[in-house]
Structures are given as C-alpha cells and as structure tokens.
Regions:
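"A position-specific structural signal for the A-helix of alpha-solenoid helical repeats
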Residues: 15, 19, 47-54, 89, ...
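Short coil/turn connectors between adjacent alpha-helices in alpha-solenoid helical repeat scaffolds
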Residues: 21-24, 53-68, 94-110, 138-149
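Amphipathic alpha-helical repeat scaffolds
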Residues: 18-22, 34, 50, 74, ...
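Actinobacteria-biased recognition of intrinsically disordered, low-complexity terminal regions
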Residues: 1-31
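Conserved binding/catalytic microenvironments
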Residues: 92, 98, 115-118, 122-151
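Short, charge-rich amphipathic alpha-helical segments embedded
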Residues: 36-59
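Residue signature of alpha-solenoid helical repeat architecture, marking inter-repeat boundaries
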Residues: 11, 43-46, 81-88, 125-127
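Alpha-helical repeat scaffolds
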Residues: 31-40, 62-78, 104-118, 145-151
C-alpha cells in the first residue's frame, strides 16, 4: 500500500529514511525530502509526487516538477490501490492549481478523485484522505459546503 506524504508515515522512528523525509517536510524542505526518495518503485514515487504537490499548494511553485513526479508515480502503479492513490494525488494537484489560479483544472480534479474513489476500497487506509480531498473540491471549487459534508 502506498503511503502519501500526508500520512505521517515514518514519525515513529522505525524507518530512518521516513524519519528524515518527515523532518525535512515539517521544515518546508519538500524538494530535499523528495530527493531522498527513490523514483523507481511505486510507493516512494507516489510519496515523492505527494511531497512536490504539497510544495505547490504552499509555495505556488514547482508545478512542472510535481507533474513529472506524478507521471512517474502513475506509470509505476500496478495495483488498483496504487493507481487510486496516484489518481488521488493527480486530483489534489489539479485542485491546488485551480485554487491558486495557475490554471482551471477543476474538471480534472473532480475526474481524478472520482477515478480514485472507484479504485480505492472503502476500508483502505488511503480512503479517508481521498474523501477529505473530495470534500475540499466540493467546498472550495464547487462552492457547495453541503456536498463537502457528503464527501
């Protein structure tokens, strides 16, 4: 199962790499944290893409690097959960781009999060994050707070 950068994975001290990534991320060193992760396996590639998407949300820069990392993660995803997690990140990056006025990608955000909902089972660990992001899109892009509660 792929863990995104938002999962808090690695904060227990069990994995030195994840601890280093978490520490860098908590200091807003997203590119440095992403550079530690190998881009040749599905879970680390997805975590790398999530870190770079988070950087875009907070700094409004690095969009191309985040897109490249996301394409890599999508290409490496094999299982439905991995593909769903990659679609969730694609939706979140599209949401961030729309929110910051970089480009209107609201339709892409909704479509990607819908794909993710079809691929990620309700009991999966990544489902709560997906539902939260669907609520963000409903509330902030569609302007329908009631739909956010349903998501």
């Amino acid at each position: 199962v792929a863990h995104t950068a938002m999962s808090g994975n690695g904060t227990t001290g069990d994995d030195p790499l994840q601890t280093a990534v978490w520490r860098l991320r908590s200091r807003a060193c997203w590119a440095d944290a992403a550079a530690l992760l190998p881009a040749d396996r599905p879970a680390p590639a997805l975590q790398r893409a999530a870190l770079l998407a988070e950087r875009c949300l907070y700094t409004e820069r690095g969009w191309e690097e985040a897109e490249d990392a996301l394409r890599t993660a999508e290409a490496l995803a094999h299982s439905d959960e991995e593909r769903g997690a990659a679609a969730c990140e694609r939706g979140y990056l599209a949401y961030a781009a729309t929110l910051h006025g970089v480009r209107d990608r609201a339709d892409e955000a909704r479509a990607a999060l819908g794909r993710a909902a079809a691929l990620i089972p309700p009991q999966a660990a990544g489902r709560a994050l997906l539902d939260f992001r669907r609520g963000l899109v409903a509330q902030n892009l569609a302007g329908v707070p009631q739909a956010a509660r349903a998501a």
